[in-house]
């Protein structure tokens, strides 16, 4: 059994025959050649499909969807076709993710502008939405103005409330005015008594 196998394989390796040569066709006709025909096919498939390319193709196909290598057997695919498929799929995935991300960001920005606008119109200043407004510079300025207004209102309320514990200014003012008026009446009355007291006492009005 071992003698007919060696002379049949020796010229195939030495001459570098292809699949279409009659020497390899004769291998398939013999009973012993049927065993070596898969070896000859694997010999010619090694340079066409490297294991690294097949692994990359399998990983990309698992991540993106149904694998093309399972639907179509390996020997029927050309080496250039497999490389182009492997290169196109990651590129398409990147483009899809890029365009999809941009689309989602645009929709988010469009939808996020409406709640911010409605809150500003209704006057809901304290309950700020987590979404940003249409422009990136206006909302911070608006929030700063609102915060400044709230601080001024709080300071004015504290200033007005600080007088509640103190005595009322009206009562204090009237007391001082009464004291001053009493002193002035005393001065006038003493002067009137001095000048007109000699002639007669007249009721001071």
From Swiss-Prot:
Q: Where in the cell is it found?
A: Mitochondrion outer membrane; Cytoplasm
Where are stretches of biased composition, namely Acidic residues? 118-128
Q: In which tissues is it expressed?
A: Expressed in all tissues tested, including brain, liver, spleen and heart. In the brain, restricted to epithelial cells of the choroid plexus. Isoform alpha is the more abundant form.
Q: Which cysteines are joined by disulfide bonds?
A: none
GO MF, one example: 14-3-3 protein binding
Q: Give GO cellular component annotations, separated by semicolons.
A: BAD-BCL-2 complex; cytoplasm; cytosol; mitochondrial outer membrane; mitochondrion
Q: Where is the composition biased (Polar residues)?
A: 85-98
Give me the ranges of the annotated region Disordered: 1-139, 161-180
Task: Spell out where the chain crosses the membrane.
Answer: none
Keyword NADP in record: no
Asymmetric dimethylarginine occurs at which residues? 132, 134
Among Pfam families, the record links this protein to: Bcl-2_BAD
User: Describe its PTM?
Assistant: Phosphorylated at one or more of Ser-113, Ser-137, Ser-156 and Ser-171 in response to survival stimuli, which blocks its pro-apoptotic activity. Phosphorylation on Ser-137 or Ser-113 promotes heterodimerization with 14-3-3 proteins. This interaction then facilitates the phosphorylation at Ser-156, a site within the BH3 motif, leading to the release of Bcl-X(L) and the promotion of cell survival. Ser-137 is the major site of AKT/PKB phosphorylation, Ser-156 the major site of protein kinase A (CAPK) phosphorylation.
GO terms, biological process:
ADP metabolic process; apoptotic process; apoptotic signaling pathway; ATP metabolic process; cellular response to chromate; cellular response to hypoxia; cellular response to lipid; cellular response to mechanical stimulus
Self-association and partners: Forms heterodimers with the anti-apoptotic proteins, Bcl-X(L), Bcl-2 and Bcl-W. Also binds protein S100A10. The Ser-113/Ser-137 phosphorylated form binds 14-3-3 proteins. Interacts with AKT1 and PIM3. Interacts with HIF3A (via C-terminus domain); the interaction reduces the binding between BAD and BAX. Interacts (via BH3 domain) with NOL3 (via CARD domain); preventing the association of BAD with BCL2. Interacts with GIMAP3/IAN4 and GIMAP5/IAN5.
This chain belongs to which protein, by name? Bcl2-associated agonist of cell death
Organism of this sequence? Rattus norvegicus
């Amino acid at each position: 059994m071992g003698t007919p196998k060696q002379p049949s394989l020796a010229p195939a390796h030495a001459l570098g025959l292809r699949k279409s040569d009659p020497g390899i066709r004769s291998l398939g006709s013999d009973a012993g050649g049927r065993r070596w025909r898969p070896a000859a096919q694997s010999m010619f498939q090694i340079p066409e499909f490297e294991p690294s390319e097949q692994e990359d193709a399998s990983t990309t196909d698992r991540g993106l969807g149904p694998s093309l290598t399972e639907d179509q057997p390996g020997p029927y695919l050309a080496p250039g076709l497999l490389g182009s498929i492997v290169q196109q799929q990651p590129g398409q995935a990147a483009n899809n993710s890029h365009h999809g991300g941009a689309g989602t960001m645009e929709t988010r920005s469009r939808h996020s502008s409406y709640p911010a606008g409605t809150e500003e119109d209704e006057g809901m200043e304290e309950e700020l939405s987590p979404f940003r407004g249409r422009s990136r510079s206006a909302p911070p300025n608006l929030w700063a103005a609102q915060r400044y207004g709230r601080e001024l209102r709080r300071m004015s309320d504290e200033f007005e409330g600080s007088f509640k514990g103190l005595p009322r200014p009206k009562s204090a003012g009237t007391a001082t005015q009464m004291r001053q008026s009493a002193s002035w009446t005393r001065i006038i009355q003493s002067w009137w008594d001095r000048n007109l007291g000699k002639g007669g006492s007249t009721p001071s009005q």
